[in-house]
Amino acid sequence: MNEIDKTIIEELASRVEELGGRAYMVGGAVRDEIMKRPIKDVDIEVHGISGAVLEAVLKKLGKPLRFGSAFGVYSLAGHQIDIALPRSERKAGNGHRDFEIEIDPFIGIKEAARRRDFTMNALLKDILSGEIADPYGGTEDIENRIIRHIDDKKFGEDPLRALRAAQFRSRFGFQVAPSTISICSALDLRNLSAERVEMEMKKALLESHRPSEFFECLREMGQLGYWFKELEQLIGLEQNPEFHPEGDVWTHTMMVLDRAAQFRPSASDPYAFMLLALTHDFGKITTTEFVNGAIHAYGHEIQGAEIAERFLDRVCHGSDIKKYISNMIPNHMRPNKIAEARSSVKKTNRMFDDAIAPNDLIYFAICDKPKLPHLDVRNLSQAPNEPHELLDDTSRESELYTADEKLREQERIKFLFDRLDLYRDMMARPYVTGKDLIDRGIMSGDDFGTILEYAHKLRLAGVSKEDALKQTLSYARKLRKNIK
């Protein structure tokens, strides 16, 4: 909250008090202040004066905008503040907007707060006195790190609250009260809009240190099945313990998801990167089998892209994200295999060229390693200069690594970043263009793309522009001669 908004809020509260009312900061802003978290959105609730009187007050402070007439909600032009009158709500249909609203400035603090979801969000702070009104024990629940619903009936009127409970658990590291888990388990999430589901999932993926807790919480509630059925299918799906000592595909996915959160700030698209971590092994649902007494999932990286696309069609509405996922899942196994084999520059160039986000591909490969130590990612935007930049030996997971294994892992990571530098250097050099070919008599045609692709392969192989042009011209003439 900036100083200008703070001044406006205090002026509003003073004018309301002069008229016999009281203005409170409510909801998440009060919770975040108590938790010493940054306050993003400020909501004000004005008690004890009518809507007409409130509008008159707001007109003296600026230009009031009534954007929620049915809810008695206002804002002031140029300010990030929502101002509302107290209200009660009653479910009147299956849609998330199907509520009967009754605005009542004199309803009282406790009844006004009853419509809120959790005790920690039912706090009010008197703007002038600083006094906290806590009708449902929210401050104690914050101290005890508990997410607890307020009213059984009203809580169950909005099924989205099951997802909100999971989202708060992942972001705050709180536990959801058993009674709240129980009531969430009985909610029907099928009529929720995909946009609302994605909104809660996105908060968990982008704002949590442990985004896995969002999905673990939904699992405890028994609420994965409709919106996240692919994730539910990972539970109990066995993996080869030689390569995945951590357990089933669900456990592996949750571990990768939490590791990916460390790389989130450096990823080219943080949200897409986190969705990659979430969906990367969906292909194991259809490919896992026993072969000669061992568990394998051959080709899961290929089939996984299609399954992930169906998942994204259900819960995600970004074409760029779908493009990212459909490219990265088929490629996600390549870095670790290539690093293990110390493959040629030509091969690493092809890998990075195929990837929509080469840096992210390396970050993800690090996350996807079983038995991986905790990572210090502060310096991962460049090839590391020192091994300790990538491994934190104080991590409990790092105890699973021997000294030799740690060294090999450091070397593999450095190998990939070194090769990425080589690839970028190669891509910065002069190369054969379509204009170069046209200038030398190779006119555009149906096969022009094939000819340019040949030139690009030479570029990836490190062939100089001069030599690549000669070879491409020769290839083009032979190709067209054969076609004729």
Identify the meaning behind each predicted range:
Residues 1-484:
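Catalytic cores of the polymerase beta-like nucleotidyltransferase superfamily
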